[in-house]
Amino acid sequence: MNLHQFRFVQEAVRRNLNLTEAAKALHTSQPGVSKAIIELEEELGIEIFARHGKRIKRVTEPGAQVLKSIEVILREVNNLKRIGEQLSLIHI
């Protein structure tokens, strides 16, 4: 489980479940995004997204709960980065 996987899930939802668009927005490949999301699902033991074949159709109910946690985690990571930047300016 890592922050890249969290960002991929978040961006996939932002891009209306279009992994190609999510990959473009994150400057990476669509197969990489797809693989990372599947690996996260396997690690968590749930399906974040309902699929029809290879196409993502919707966020599952457990996926919605995971997404809420992902959003909190990524928001806190950004807060930590901001704190680090502010403190590094003070110590220069």
Task: Name each region found by the language model.
Residues 90-92:
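Conserved small/polar residues in nucleotide/adenosyl-binding loops
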Residues 9-10, 22-23, 60-63:
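Hydrophobic two-helix hairpin corresponding to the core of helix-turn-helix DNA-binding domains
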Residues 41-59:
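A short LG(V/I)-centered, amphipathic sequence patch enriched
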Residues 43-44, 66-88:
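Alpha-helical linker/hinge and terminal dimerization helices associated
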Residues 12-27:
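Short helix-boundary/capping micro-motifs
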Residues 9, 39-40:
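DNA major-groove recognition helices of helix-turn-helix
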